[in-house]
């Protein structure tokens, strides 16, 4: 439920190259090629299938329809493949199997939290979940390898985070029992990037903020969870915003404080066993999302007066800012492509 403010922007047509963001400080090895897809949208959902195919999702800053876009040519062109009747919704997460099959999550209180699924590249969508619990607010989702079992996490209901699961690729969802979920007081998820929940192998993790900044870990596909304090600051607008794992043991959490977005101190944490977390290097900007790119880790952040993109080559112990251009969400692929998306309908590729 803890979300960053959207940015006011003007409408721009489908993707034409806008700018190439040169990295400062001599970091000439990485640079964003930035494209505007739809400037009425703030993109916080992104799933990159490979260097050719990517899906992005967002919300209108002018009160119009929430949109989902798909590219199959490396970002040269984008198709509007949005579900019908999406006015007022906020598509904060999209998870794709390929160019035809994808699942998108709309966030919000009560019935605003919904899940849609397509198997024909967005030509048609089926609503497969609509929240009926007034106090629930779903923030992000992910799928286990194979694409059948998936999880989505909501802010606490009756003092515990709520998890829904699917075993048929998102065609149907059920609320899981909360007996295996630790108690939570004053915590919530940040739907900053669509990656407040992430999966690697059979393990799943999600982050929290608010009264505590914790990372919850499940080794049984979401049935039971253990909570560990992170080293990322807690606060009303502070906590863990995004998680990424190279494998079930090696991962990174990023976050910060939206109320002091220029402060990247203690904004990253790392794990070497999937369970315990240690303080990573300070960032020069807020960390909203992270992804592994070959032997490096990339972090992006856009919210607040200072945005940027940084890279680490030592597993998150030290960071080097390579661009003053920031984004809300990030995804890198097995074939070495890296995609990012953010406010004003922008998409970047490395």
Regions found by a protein language model. Name each.
Residues 1-22:
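Secretory targeting and sorting signals
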Residues 25-350:
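Residue-level hotspots at or immediately adjacent to binding/recognition sites across diverse folds
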């Amino acid at each position: 439920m803890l979300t960053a403010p959207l940015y006011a922007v003007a409408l721009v047509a489908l993707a034409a190259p806008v700018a190439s963001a040169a990295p400062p400080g001599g970091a000439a090895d990485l640079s964003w090629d930035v494209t505007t897809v739809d400037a009425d949208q703030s993109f916080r959902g992104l799933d990159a299938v490979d260097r050719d195919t990517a899906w992005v999702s967002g919300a209108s800053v002018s009160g119009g329809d929430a949109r989902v876009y798909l590219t199959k040519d490396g970002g040269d062109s984008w198709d509007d493949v949005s579900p019908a009747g999406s006015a007022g919704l906020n598509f904060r997460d999209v998870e794709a199997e390929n160019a035809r099959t994808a699942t998108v999550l709309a966030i919000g209180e009560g019935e605003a939290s919904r899940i849609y699924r397509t198997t024909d590249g967005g030509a048609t969508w089926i609503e497969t979940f609509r929240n009926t619990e007034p106090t629930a607010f779903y923030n992000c989702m992910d799928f286990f390898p194979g694409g059948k079992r998936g999880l989505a996490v909501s802010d606490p209901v009756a003092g515990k985070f709520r998890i829904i699961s699917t075993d048929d690729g998102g065609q149907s969802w059920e609320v899981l029992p909360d007996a295996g979920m630790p108690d939570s007081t004053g915590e919530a998820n940040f739907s900053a990037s669509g990656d407040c929940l992430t999966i690697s192998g059979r393990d799943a993790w999600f982050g929290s903020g608010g009264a505590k900044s914790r990372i919850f870990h499940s080794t049984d596909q979401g049935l039971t969870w253990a909570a560990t304090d992170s080293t990322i600051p807690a606060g009303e607008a502070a906590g863990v915003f995004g998680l990424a794992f190279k494998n079930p043991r090696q991962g990174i959490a990023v976050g910060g404080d939206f109320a002091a977005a220029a402060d990247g101190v203690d904004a990253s944490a790392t794990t070497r066993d999937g369970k315990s977390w240690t303080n990573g290097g300070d960032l020069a900007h807020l960390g909203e999302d992270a992804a592994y790119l070959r032997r490096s880790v990339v972090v992006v952040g856009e919210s607040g007066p200072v945005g940027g993109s940084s890279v680490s080559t030592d597993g998150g112990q030290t960071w080097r800012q390579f661009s003053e251009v920031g984004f809300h969400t990030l995804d890198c692929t097995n074939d070495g492509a890296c995609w990012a998306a953010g406010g004003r309908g922008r998409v970047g590729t490395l």
